[in-house]
Amino acid sequence: MEDGFSSYSSLYDTSSLLQFCNDDSASAASSMEVTDRIASLEQRVQMQEDDIQLLKSALADVVRRLNITEEQQAVLNRKGPTKARPLMQTLPLRTTVNNGTVLPKKPTGSLPSPSGVRKETAVPATKSNIKRTSSSERVSPGGRRESNGDSRGNRNRTGSTSSSSSGKKNSESKPKEPVFSAEEGYVKMFLRGRPVTMYMPKDQVDSYSLEAKVELPTKRLKLEWVYGYRGRDCRNNLYLLPTGETVYFIASVVVLYNVEEQLQRHYAGHNDDVKCLAVHPDRITIATGQVAGTSKDGKQLPPHVRIWDSVTLNTLHVIGIGFFDRAVTCIAFSKSNGGTNLCAVDDSNDHVLSVWDWQKEEKLADVKCSNEAVFAADFHPTDTNIIVTCGKSHLYFWTLEGSSLNKKQGLFEKQEKPKFVLCVTFSENGDTITGDSSGNILVWGKGTNRISYAVQGAHEGGIFALCMLRDGTLVSGGGKDRKLISWSGNYQKLRKTEIPEQFGPIRTVAEGKGDVILIGTTRNFVLQGTLSGDFTPITQGHTDELWGLAIHASKSQFLTCGHDKHATLWDAVGHRPVWDKIIEDPAQSSGFHPSGSVVAVGTLTGRWFVFDTETKDLVTVHTDGNEQLSVMRYSPDGNFLAIGSHDNCIYIYGVSDNGRKYTRVGKCSGHSSFITHLDWSVNSQFLVSNSGDYEILYWVPSACKQVVSVETTRDIEWATYTCTLGFHVFGVWPEGSDGTDINAVCRAHEKKLLSTGDDFGKVHLFSYPCSQFRAPSHIYGGHSSHVTNVDFLCEDSHLISTGGKDTSIMQWRVI
């Protein structure tokens, strides 16, 4: 316990508070003007509030740790004596369902109550038109367990909505039901009205029935780790909590990452991209805003703000449903009144600024902010009624008076007006400080809209971030020059350091523990370090659309590759990259050789590379066609490599020297559309392929010949099952699917589980085989874009999923 409190004392040094309180000169009228005395009192109150919040945060962390210990003890008591396990495997057993609430651990196979854990959800709706949301994992009408927020409310302002996730509305016409032919031994399903015929093994023909029921898998998934950070297009989204956790977001998940303990917790109450984040003055309550989305049935998912507890991960309030348009891009809590109010800016054409009493879920005022983009909005630290917004071609000082917001424009006067005011913060005496696209730091006197001081050319290029440290030091972060500079109270330069080019421009800066600075970059790195030392990454991820995923055959490692031209080998135990390789073309697919010694990466241009997995050195490079290579799949014996291309062909290579020599055998031609998926037979003699027009074809790859005999192909045992079309997996397709809803399928090595990734940001877990129409599944959210790939680690202990445009990688523990 003492260690826990000592960590907080390093965050907030209270000795200065005691010294200040004992200084009688602070109240001597003869030595101070009235305004100075008021400022001093404001500082004193703020310091006392900080100290109180320190104690609150410490107590909250104690409660959190006790909850973890109790849950672990309960699990151990149920399971009885077990072998000792490493701390990394035992601590993540905290049960957090996808609505961001903590539920008691239940025996495997039991379902959480749909009513959730929040008592207030059982109370009839009050006069507020904004419903408090408590979603929990549930079984959908089709038997599928879902984790979705209940979003209700009428829009007060209309406008277009958009989403990064691929919402698709199913056809209104009733889809055709599957047909079973006992004579021929096949099931025929229909996608977009087109028949897809799938032959079953002979020994299943007599016993098969379309009406048979499939049970939900007894296993479940729990989100253990999220790789990545959204810095490329979001700001002010990185904070250190007093508990020692760094909080940030990617996709629809807010990550709370304890770097020292190497543990992550996740708030997953959102149903689409999170775009903004704010921490309450109590340092425990957090607000996050999201974009509008569309569900798989075409239902609109409105943008909103969720306020939640960072200790319990319980959702406290949901505001703005039916009011915000497109997305919520900026949010901030008030400071001087204990954080009672919250301001938000949406992404409508008018970029409406609104102020809320978030505890009552009531809107106090709203106003059109600007026709141009708004980058930041924040309350003045000592005046609750003052809000500052900045963005393209503007800096506005807003005064809240009753239910109206009155605007004063920042006057640049002799100072050349910048194209963009990029960031804003406040000094100890209440001055407003801005950083702009011209590289200038401008100081605006407290209570005025005029410049009182200017630091010309503070950076070469735009200043993307400003952070006022607890000791009154100002830190600025440059975009173009990637420099981090500290400034004294009178704006004299103290220190500067340059962030290495590989990490990209600085997007946001936050104060860490002690003299540590946290940096988020536009290349989606989170760095930590000091102004006098080096900065090292604590989180990193891809920066462009992500499709390629390959699992090592014998190690807890996996490789991802994307359109950002990066191929990264990850350690799933240490949750960090083993190496990262920049390639010449955008990458689309990858596959490990069975020996694990090499990995192949396919690109959008028809080129493919083979890398040594130990050294990341290039082994060989080849080109087949000039179109996207969607699949790279080695045969189980390691003697062949099959490459599925968007030119409708499958290229076959003979492989020798443990994956280091390649000889082209030929190409399999016969598909009338692009290749989507490939699987090898256990004996490496046959290949099955799917295409974009729902064809299922079989091949003898050594001769590049198609196999048309049903009697030959129906009983083949497949080493993997990644094809989305086939008798053993057709139950994964939802009713009315258009044939593109499911991007990836993967069978576990033990052949009892099947996972899929769909176009609606969901990861599904089915029982295998999945050969009954509309089979039930457990459904998990987290991704905000289409889930492009899923695969089980070599021992089936974890599942890895990749998001497309959300660029995230999620590691799920199989429990």
UniProtKB/Swiss-Prot annotation:
Changing residue 786 to A: Abolishes tubulin binding. SMART domains: WD40. It is found in: Cytoplasm; Cytoplasm, Perinuclear region; Cytoplasm, Cytoskeleton. Residues 92-101, 126-138 have a biased composition (Polar residues). Residues 77-179 are annotated as: Disordered. Ubiquitous; expressed in most tissues with the exception of thymus and peripheral blood lymphocytes. GO terms for biological process: brain development; hematopoietic progenitor cell differentiation; microtubule cytoskeleton organization; mitotic spindle organization; neuroblast proliferation. SUPFAM superfamilies: Quinoprotein alcohol dehydrogenase-like, WD40 repeat-like. Residues 156-168 have a biased composition (Low complexity). Residues 31-72 form a coiled coil. GO terms for cellular component: cytosol; microtubule; microtubule associated complex; mitotic spindle midzone; mitotic spindle pole; perinuclear region of cytoplasm. The keyword Phosphoprotein applies. Residues 176-815 are annotated as: Tandem atypical propeller in EMLs. The keyword Lyase does not apply. WD repeats lie at residues 261-310, 315-358, 363-400, 409-446, 450-489, 493-530, 535-572, 578-613, 617-655, 664-701, 709-768, 775-814. PANTHER family: ECHINODERM MICROTUBULE-ASSOCIATED PROTEIN-LIKE 1, WD-40 REPEAT PROTEIN. Contains a tandem atypical propeller in EMLs (TAPE) domain. The N-terminal beta-propeller is formed by canonical WD repeats; in contrast, the second beta-propeller contains one blade that is formed by discontinuous parts of the polypeptide chain. This is Echinoderm microtubule-associated protein-like 1. It comes from Homo sapiens. The gene is EML1.
